[in-house]
Amino acid sequence: MALPSSSLSSQIHTGATTQCIPHFHGSLNAGTSAGKRRSLYLRWGKGPSKIVACAGQDPFSVPTLVKREFPPGFWKDHVIESLMPSYKVAPSDEKRIETLITEIKNMFRSMGYGETNPSAYDTAWVARIPAVDGSEKPQFPETLEWILQNQLKDGSWGEEFYFLAYDRILATLACIITLTIWQTGDTQVQKGIEFFKTQAGKIEEEADSHRPSGFEIVFPAMLKEAKALGLALPYELPFIQQIIEKREAKLQRLPPDLLYALPTTLLYSLEGLQEIVDWEKIMKLQSKDGSFLSSPASTAAVFMRTGNKKCLEFLNFVLKKFGNHVPCHYPLDLFERLWAVDTVERLGIDHHFKEEIKDALDYVYSHWDERGIGWARENPVPDIDDTAMGLRILRLHGYNVSSDVLKTFRDENGEFFCFLGQTQRGVTDMLNVNRCSHVAFPGETIMEEAKLCTERYLRNALEDGGASDKWALKKNIRGEVEYALKYPWHRSMPRLEARSYIENYGPNDVWLGKTMYMMPNISNEKYLELAKLDFNRVQFFHRQELQDIRRWWNSSGFSQLGFTRERVAEIYFSPASFLFEPEFATCRAVYTKTSNFTVILDDLYDAHGTLDNLKLFSESVKRWDLSLVDQMPQDMKICFKGFYNTFNEIAEEGRKRQGRDVLSYIQKVWEVQLEAYTKEAEWSAVRYVPSYDEYIGNASVSIALGTVVLISALFTGEILTDDILSKIGRDSRFLYLMGLTGRLVNDTKTYQAERGQGEVASAVQCYMKDHPEISEEEALKHVYTIMDNALDELNREFVNNRDVPDTCRRLVFETARIMQLFYMDGDGLTLSHNMEIKEHVKNCLFQPVA
């Protein structure tokens, strides 16, 4: 119904309440090109409001809508051509990729109890054990021989290619004591003593965070042994006295019965507590596998004191695996599997290993405990590092795990710790808790608490210039932390994370237990080589696809449209950043073309076309009638012809893939979309500010994410039944949450600029209308809260919607995430030429990794 241009009041009754609008004399200037004015075509649906034009009242002025002036697109053809690298996928690259995939699959399939390197320290303790037959020989002579054969050139024992003074000094001290006990290797002992004398002082130069676990317990105890054996060591060095004092202080803080009350990390260092341990009581805390917290050294010390057969069985088990040496702890089966899965996912190569990942996670889940897990399946002491990693990965893969497991690791002050009784936290464990906290479900307050606590800790670590870690020596842990804080889960797209982690990943990273150790199934060159080759290969295909999209854009005449934003590369970046696998090329193309039309038509309906012409456009889509184009202005002719031809082609391809006609489905999707655009145009024309609920009901559709997803889903490689389509359809909670979160993040970053251009309806403004007593700042805060809660619910829908094919679930969820990225700091689509999005596009599509 058109409002008449008379001086008389008119009333349109559509509900129970009345709102005043001003008179309109003539037609409303839409601020478009000369001679074009927006007619007041109004279509009112059902609702509680009625709008009236009230004579003599002017409750708000009707501003001239400001013509949209968009920055020109940055990614023109000549820019894209100038950035095209010389890289092409060579046959040798394809062959190498296949070889690496096979080797890594075999790596996953061969995972047992954990692969790791020798620990000279633990091997020395096992070598101390006298033969059980009473002969004056070692029970494990092969371990003693290993010590004799593996002294380094500088006289130390330890990891040859990674010098850590704490680690070298501790291992060297253990080895020279063992050799002295067995009265062998005099030359090695003297070289070891010389190393100790010349290098011990370097410990003072190392960060406290690099001090191995339990060092202040076992090192002073071994020094006491060395002194009793007459070894000439510099016992009076200041740092040695400081370590002894730390040991005494720690033991004084230890409640007398804590050692025996429940399993703690003290079980890991019993060799350093021999003078205070009640050996009968301690046996109650022995693990099922016979070890004490998987530590060969601790277990060896207990065996020498008790002769316990299960201890001996454990040591025999470890030596059967490793031959003539032992690691610093074993097994490491849960740790190895979780971190291997996390590594291939972060490097972006997980799509090659779906079966292997499932097998690994099935194994972990079979040993999941509601109190948490440790690094091994029979480890009685859970830690927050493995638990948080397990909670996040298992949840995202659809396993039923509760966030309540984190309560095990929260103290009375609300702070989170790694182990029971621990006073120091590490960067890597807090980083993993932080990453975990972002996959929260609604109402999980423990996840919110974990997020706030770990963000505070990690930001402080960065500000202090540290970000060094007590559990790992990584290539660039600082870079990992910076990425996680800047791009948390809901704005971290897979290709961007892969790019970042390829740069931060260390194939030679080491971990810190009681000694330094390596995990070759977690850190290795094969993962990195495959990640680089695969990234560059996928990027090459993406560049070719983008060129095809550019040709489509130009041949359709869209470059002639002066009223809209040309953002072809930025829009293509969206699906390429998450649905990146080569087999989804058609889906990416459909996603990009559909998205481009949502931008064109949004700009058309928002501020360019008259309402009469918009009605004609909508009717043309509804009737799918090209003949109506003759009644349209030239720019709208270009729009509709391109629209008509493109979606006819898409529908034909969809028919082939789905085995049924999909054109009517696509039409209906677009009808709903254009209705939402039209309603916004009507509101804008009369300066109508709806209630928040009324606004969101329409705006969650007008954001157009649903239209993009519902059409693109036809090309995910799955046959989509009506039942499946209903689960991601307009009435589904899943799709609604995607649209809601996309709309809210858009509004929070653009409402002020759009208000200056004459727009009156946004989530913030509509909420303020419902609650006139609150400030704009309070309204904005409330909208953010709504969005955060909706993102939590979106997590749950994504994880639990297992009736929906994985690729369709990804399509919905990742589309919500890309919106969080684009509107992270502002309007990343409109202003992408001078924002970080430009760098993301470049890194994702044009810049190969070296």
Swiss-Prot record:
Question: So what does this thing catalyse?
Answer: (2E,6E,10E)-geranylgeranyl diphosphate = (+)-copalyl diphosphate; (+)-copalyl diphosphate = abieta-8(14),12-diene + diphosphate; (+)-copalyl diphosphate = neoabietadiene + diphosphate
For the keyword Lyase, the answer is yes
Name the positions where substrate binds: 250, 470
EC assignment: 4.2.3.32, 4.2.3.132, 5.5.1.12
* UniProt-annotated binding residues for Mg(2+) 3: 746, 750, 754
Identify the pathway: Terpene metabolism; oleoresin biosynthesis
Q: Could you tell me which InterPro entries the record lists for this protein?
A: Isoprenoid_synthase_dom_sf, Terpene_cyclase-like_1_C, Terpene_cyclase_plant_C1, Terpene_synth_N, Terpene_synth_N_sf, Terpene_synthase-like, Terpene_synthase_metal-bd, Terpenoid_cyclase/PrenylTrfase
Transit peptide location on this chain: 1-52
> Which Pfam family would be a valid example here?
Terpene_synth
UniProt keyword list: Chloroplast, Isomerase, Lyase, Magnesium, Metal-binding, Multifunctional enzyme, Plastid, Transit peptide
List the GO terms this entry assigns under cellular component, sorted alphabetically: chloroplast
Q: Which residues bind Mg(2+) 1?
A: 602, 606
* Entry cofactors: Mg(2+)
Cofactor binding annotation: Binds 3 Mg(2+) ions per subunit.
Comment, domains: The Asp-Xaa-Asp-Asp (DXDD) motif is important for the catalytic activity in the class II active site relevant for the cyclization of GGPP. The Asp-Asp-Xaa-Xaa-Asp/Glu (DDXXD/E) motif is important for the catalytic activity in the class I active site, presumably through binding to Mg(2+).
What exactly does this protein do? Involved in defensive oleoresin formation in conifers in response to insect attack or other injury. Involved in diterpene (C20) olefins biosynthesis. Bifunctional enzyme that catalyzes two sequential cyclizations of geranylgeranyl diphosphate (GGPP) to levopimaradiene. Levopimaradiene is the major products of the enzyme followed by abietadiene, neoabietadiene and palustradiene. No activity with geranyl diphosphate (GPP) or farnesyl diphosphate (FPP) as substrate.
Q: Would you identify the family this protein belongs to, as annotated?
A: Belongs to the terpene synthase family. Tpsd subfamily.
Name of protein: Bifunctional levopimaradiene synthase, chloroplastic
Please spell out the taxonomic lineage of the organism that makes this protein.
Eukaryota, Viridiplantae, Streptophyta, Embryophyta, Tracheophyta
